[in-house]
Amino acid sequence: MNFLLTLAYDGTNYCGFQVQPNGRSVAAVFQDALEAVLGTRPDIKGCSRTDAGVHALGFRLNFHAGTRIPPEKLPLALNQHLPPDIRVLAARVVPEDFHARYAAHTKTYLYRIHNHPIDSPFDAAYYTRMPKHLDEVRMQAAAQQFVGTHDFLALCAAGSSAAAHGDTVRTITDCHVTRRGDEIDIEVTADGYLYNMVRILAGTLCEVGAGRMQPEQIPGILAGCDRSQAGPTLPAKGLFLKCVEYPDMKENHS
């Protein structure tokens, strides 16, 4: 059977989702739990390769395994063998040819900013602090300029294989900025992403919010395909993979 699982994890203590030769990855720890529960170590296919320090609220992965454990019982069974910073939220059976990455229709990322001169001692690992006041109205105006199908090379970090192959066109279907008190959330939904794209996009919006860029500059930055014209790459700790949507699948958020 092919199982699709939804995970949430705190990426602080991991080198990312993907198995790495010299680092503790979410995938390796999850495979340890699978082996403890199933007696085998199946290959797992993640929906994304989240980087070191990036968190997930609704990460999707699938694997093939033969087990008598019903899917609704898998979360509890696996969570008993996982550390507290990784949790299985839901499980279901999907078609044999389903692939969590290639079947994804859209992925939504959330970037959290604490806009205050003083850091919080409680959740500083889950946002990036910006001490200077940011104008969220200007940021929202700039965010709308990213919506659509564009060449996002200007928002791509150096060393990207996609950039090397000229594969840098993506479609953003939604990009918006909201403020709640001192917290600013940047949410982006797209059909795919380039390396560090969301962190650079968030950094660019912060430049606009701080008055160092104008919202009207965004189309020119995208058209120029020049990384140096966009904003800085913000830290990984403020980034969350929020959800992954699949076409024709009910209960996409479960």
Regions found by a protein language model. Name each.
Residues 1-254:
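Structured-RNA-binding interfaces characteristic of tRNA pseudouridine synthases
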